């Protein structure tokens, strides 16, 4: 909205805005500096905010936590507390418009341990989720895993309160969280209830140790509520003088009312909860009911003062608000501490419990500092230049600034920022931790960084320093009022004058008559003695009058001789200092007209005391009669008597004359809301107004500001009088009327509100005749004077029309005026007039009146008529209230037609209305009639549609049929011939394509050679820890971080007795085997549970592999017993038992070294070669199908023609890769059908191959730019030039799309914008596989039309064979590295387990050799090698694409076929995946049999050799995993089936001791469970 300050349009004339009003509007614009300040907008309402000294600003909104930089322009990281990865609020109950402090989903946001030597800063967060969960995370990045977490620390209710502070206890290195929370409160039935543990239901304040490990924390103490205390709402927590203070107030969450007085609880800053009492706070001054709500809190530690915002309203609206609803009260902490030693009435204290009804005296605030305001919401206090500064937020979006005087007296607040939307300010104001010139202002969903002062609005030095703002000072080099940091050369003390200097110290040039024949020009003010020069010139002629240089310890001064200078009227004086200049222009033309001594001397003229007149400074006067001192001159003027007439109205204290006492009565004041511009006609109603001679209105707003006294404008009659109220800031004021100096009678409250703001005009289009209902949406419409439509006539003349309107606070309704005299199509401006100011509200478009083409009357039943009126299509939004339809029948009969709906068709719009409850409807429908339509001001009669005669129709029908038949025969014959011709062309094209593809496929098989890179650098092996976890938990990524906790940094004293006992119990073989068998017999012990249990057991026994191997032997024998009676060949084939998964894990542990040393390199070469072959041809980005593949299902047979394009790629030099040895100009081959993303990948791979090291940036951090001469164009997968196919499908851009030719130069550059992750395109995009649509054929042209349509998949099956040939040698090398024996020795694990299987077969008297072969195959190739072959990401630090996965599945199947004893009978119809390696399988089978035989023929391993090998492996993996976590997970299964296990132990002999140990372990765990942590 723009505020128009012109005088108004010429017709009709309006009075111009008065000068004071314009000055006020300029003053209002001063806080608008914040309009350009950075703002962060979140998806949900902000619930918490905190600033770190090194890691930015943290903002919690909904279920998200954002880490922002200090400028709020960039988000550094984001944490989603919602598992779905969004920021939605988790309950259906929306928070109120003004939530109480702490009433949100984010309860705590506490950075701590910042700046501690050698320690990383941490962030403690508390949420309502997970029963009031807390997390501790590193401050640097929210995406890192939480270090510690726990539940039931904060309130789990969105409306419940929580306040906390983290501190380091004296004498220790431990950090503690002191937290106060509302754990229990009644909630509506629709809310998600959360019930804390019984021990927490009466807890008010608790102390937690933040250093405890995950799931092993301990509560250090608590302070409980008294039984009669009710709910407490905690607002803040802070440290002072060795104690922790918690401001709070008793609150009934059901009724929404405070039940007691605000208080402050105090505990010791210690390692346990030591209650030190509580103190009640009194901030009731100026409010009859008292202020029982505490809205905000701030400790001003530098002066030991605590500031609080208190309120008497609930904050849920304006219905109970008054000018004295809220107040800022300041308390001395020493007094609070003294009163806190009294008895306690809200908490269960061991001493000093209050008796029932006994309430101690409340602490009184500092009276001079109390500030009463209608709507404060927040406070933050600090000390600047020994001045206490308080920032206050308001409910209408203002940020106020209060500077306390030396005796702590509050001044009138300055408005330093206003939020345009008037959103209530959040209860917490956060200062910038690094720059004290900014403060973070939170409101609704937004956070703004606001300067703490508007220094620049003060234009002169005296104005700057007189404002007494400690943040501002006068910058001499810039000659502006600035922050000290914004002043050039501010490091020099003399260049920046702060408020301690005072306005009298401002530098100023003075011209003084010193002697009869000489006038001195000098400079006064706070100027230290330094080198300076001064020059005085005649401004009219430029003649030099005098000049000088500074003498020692004196500033420059020069003397002007008087006699030659009588005729000089304008003088320019300039003083030059080393870093700044001061110039001033003196005009002596009007000296004689100045009647006051101070004004005379201030202008440079001379005051002659003898004659008491102002003279030209060079005019002679007796020397003793010159007055040179402006201050003495000012004192002399003040002592002289002055006329008291005019000026402000002074309140008369005289008494009324004797006689009858006249009673004056005030009833009301109208309106009760006016804009900040004031109002010239405010009416006060009452009685006996004409009996008073002196009537004034007194307005009292903020208590520390001056009140306004306004004399009555006009007494209309005995009951009505009119006042003209001045402009003011936004606030609510008390109004009282004073008659003849008597008592001021209250007239109620008056609200100054912001100017109206328009957001929407509905509808925005109307017809030229007008009369349509128009609604304007916005806010503050209840203060407008009238609404104006301004439009332009022919000849560019403007006409303003006042329209009648009905306005409420949020909308205005009016009828569009008739503009028949205007152009047919015109836009008019809608304006609001407030006082003499015009506000633009938007435009309303006028179009030509609607055109009605006819109507039809139909009757389906005899008591109802339907009238359908046809209208040309237009852009009018016609509603039921806009239209009135009447049907006339006969001479005097008329019927009102009830509007039903409007239907818009392609050609016409139909308006349907109905006439109900009539007689003879059919007769009326068939007789003569007419219809009148009134649309706003438009009234017209609609003609009835003409209906063709049935007779003519019957004649024309046979002729039309004959024509149609002839045309159909001709068209059919033509179409038949055309179809035959097209089919012949398409068959020829198909034959040609088949011949070409067969020949190309044959040539490729014979000639193609893949240039495999022999030197692919270091193989990127994963370390053992991650290899093991990926094989142990292939589908559960959530265990990685808890098992990989750094075990070296754990405290040796932090051992858990319960886990130690469980570890000892598991090492009992009989007990462990019994537990496993018992668990497997439970029906709900699923296959997933068996696999997880086996993996947890492997980790727990990672350093006891000898023992683990013995367990494996026992369980394997037991499994053989089960299978031998049924089908022995099926043993170990599936993973359905603990031992089968245990065997997989055991093989992974024991063969990790063999995998890394022998198999790893050929395996990595296979993956690299396969990937290189796939990328040699086209790959569809959307489906991942490729031309070169091993899997028919992933074959890209809809392949277009493609060509290789050689690019000259130039890599930009970046800080991440600044080596001089790096080659930055590289030739890269891409395909013209590659997307830009695929081209990036090939460019990255080329850089790695060329330089042996990566570029240094991620793929999504770079962009490609085509350079043609001096022009550059960024290449993107999707941009404005992308082809849009049928149904809105977008075709991704390719190299060919940009018409990039061989030798083109491509620049690789680092993106500046926020990086996004790799794009996964949806179904609305396509690449190479295109939709079968006409739009595609039009785009591609005739050359590709038939080819695309007649593609046949079988034409490209040779590509499978081509891919197989390319990788065949590498594949065979891999297979033989697996089933070969290096140095004629098998790995220990394989030899040991194969011998174990042979021995068991002999013991079982199994003579079938196939059974043992199958056992070995199921235990090694199937259980281990196939898992590795299909998942290279288990072994290497690489990303497996879906296409690579499909190819590796084919290779893995061929690998297993080599171990199969069954002969494959393949026919021509067999799957291609089987046929591809059909000829190779027999050879592989023979090699496998030789491999098995060679292992069997090797000498057996001794038990000593095997134990030594297992012991060495155990030592290798010490401290790799957090074994205590694994033991905890195992215990969860044991305790779940505790009764079954205990019953089994009771039945087994020899396990009595194990039974006792198990019971002991359970007792230890139960005791540990009682100790809770955050």
From Swiss-Prot:
GO BP term, example: regulation of synapse pruning
Traits of the deletion mutant: No visible phenotype.
Stretches in topological domain Extracellular: 35-950
Ranges of residues in domain Sema: 35-452
Signal peptide: 1-34
TM helices/strands, residue ranges: 951-971
Keywords in alphabetical order: Disulfide bond, Glycoprotein, Membrane, Phosphoprotein, Receptor, Signal, Transmembrane, Transmembrane helix
Disulfide bond annotation, renumbered to this chain: 64-87, 156-194, 283-329, 455-472, 461-506, 464-481, 475-487
Residues carrying covalently attached carbohydrate according to the record: 86, 143, 149, 252, 386, 407, 694, 773, 802
Free-text tissue specificity from the UniProt record: Detected on dendritic cells, skin Langerhans cells and neutrophils (at protein level).
Record topology, Cytoplasmic segments: 972-1574
The keyword Signal appears for this protein: yes
MF terms (GO), sorted A to Z: semaphorin receptor activity
Modified residues (Phosphoserine): 984
CDD domains per UniProt: IPT, RasGAP_plexin_C1, Sema_plexin_C1
SUPFAM superfamilies documented for this protein: GTPase activation domain, GAP (SSF48350), Plexin repeat (SSF103575), Sema domain (SSF101912)
Compartment annotation: Membrane
Superkingdom of origin: Eukaryota
Principal place of residence: membrane
Membrane topology: Single-pass type I membrane protein
Purpose of the protein: Receptor for SEMA7A, for vaccinia virus semaphorin A39R and for herpesvirus Sema protein. Binding of semaphorins triggers cellular responses leading to the rearrangement of the cytoskeleton and to secretion of IL6 and IL8.
Subunit structure: Monomer. Homodimer. Interacts with SEMA7A.
Similarity comment text for this entry: Belongs to the plexin family.
UniProt protein name: Plexin-C1
The species this protein was found in: Mus musculus (Mouse)
Top-level taxonomy: Eukaryota, Metazoa, Chordata, Craniata, Vertebrata
UniProt gene name: Plxnc1
